[in-house]
Each structure stands twice: as C-alpha cells, then as structure tokens.
Amino acid sequence: RTGQPIMVLFDLLSRRWAMGILWNLSNGPCSFRELQARCGSASPTVLNTRLKELREVDLVEKTTGGYALSETGRDLFKRLEPLGDWAMKWVPTL
C-alpha cells in the first residue's frame, strides 16, 4: 500500500467481486443467496470475504433485509456511477 487514500480505495475496489457487490447492492438490499445468484460465478468463500472487507470499511452493512450499501457506500456509488456511463461510451471504441 502506498498510504495514499485513492490507492487504498483502488486496491479494495480492484479485488475480485468488490465492484460487482457494490453494483448489485446499488438497487437495494439483498440476502446472501440473492447476491450470490446476481454475482454468478463468485464462490461463497470469495463473496463472504469481500462482504466482510466491505463491511469493515463501512461501505456495506448488514440489515434485516440482508446486505445493503451503507451511507458511505451509497455516496461512493454516486461518485462511481458516472464512470459507468463513461465506460458505456468508451467500450464501443475498442
């Protein structure tokens, strides 16, 4: 780790299924099984590990409805969403 906050964030988000979890939770809470179905090929071990990591940094929280984005997670997602829009325009140019 470099100690730079942006690099710490990129390190976390680049881990397998971290972005997929955030993206899938952006539509509302999911149980573990629902999230696993939405993430398709994510193993239960990887999904559990990633959820634990995302909870430890307050991006995801456990609720009565399952897992959900925390307030911090929703704020991050709002900032990432324009990147998704940009990527949709960029991909066809490849």
Task: State each model region's role.
Residues 1-5, 23, 78-94:
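Amphipathic alpha-helical dimerization/coiled-coil segments
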Residues 2-46, 52, 57-61, 68-74:
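N-terminal helix-turn-helix DNA-binding core of bacterial DNA-binding proteins
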Residues 49, 61, 90-94:
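Short, polar/charged, Gly/Pro-enriched helix-capping and turn/loop motifs at alpha-helix termini
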